[in-house]
Amino acid sequence: MVNMFKHIKKSSNNSESWNKKEWQIAEELAVKYLKEKGYKILEKNFKTPYGEIDIIANKKDIIIFVEVKSGKGIRIQPSERVDDKKYLKIVKSAEFYLEFYLKNKNYKISQIDVIEIINGNIKHYENVGWDFT
């Protein structure tokens, strides 16, 4: 298997918790950031039988599935909470979206990104592993 997270370590459970309002603010920051970088937002909080994708965007015929992670980053970075189990849910959800919503569309490639937000600071990890081509 390809190293899925070139910049992200695997982690165990984390006791940090953010309330719903803080989580929504983090996603809004991620959407704003992506729009400023030229991405078109296709979906937010897209639910599938396999899980939820925080943001689905596209840029230059590339479909990007974005997982947003936020927190204080005291003991563990928020992006480190994207472990193999979470990654597999994102992959299955992305496959579902591509199969049922973009079946007849012509997109070149798709990728999974992780956006980490700590105290309003954004780190964007692009193409963290799985390639749909």
UniProtKB/Swiss-Prot annotation:
Molecular function terms, GO-annotated: nucleic acid binding
Pfam families from the UniProt entry: UPF0102
InterPro entries in the cross-refs: Restrct_endonuc-II-like (IPR011335), tRNA_endonuc-like_dom_sf (IPR011856), UPF0102_YraN-like (IPR003509)
Coiled-coil intervals: none
Membrane spanning residue stretches: none
PANTHER family named in the record: UPF0102 PROTEIN YRAN (PTHR34039:SF1)
Family from the record: Belongs to the UPF0102 family.
Protein name, as recorded: UPF0102 protein Fnod_1509
Organism of origin: Fervidobacterium nodosum (strain ATCC 35602 / DSM 5306 / Rt17-B1)
Source organism phylogeny: Bacteria, Thermotogati, Thermotogota, Thermotogae, Thermotogales
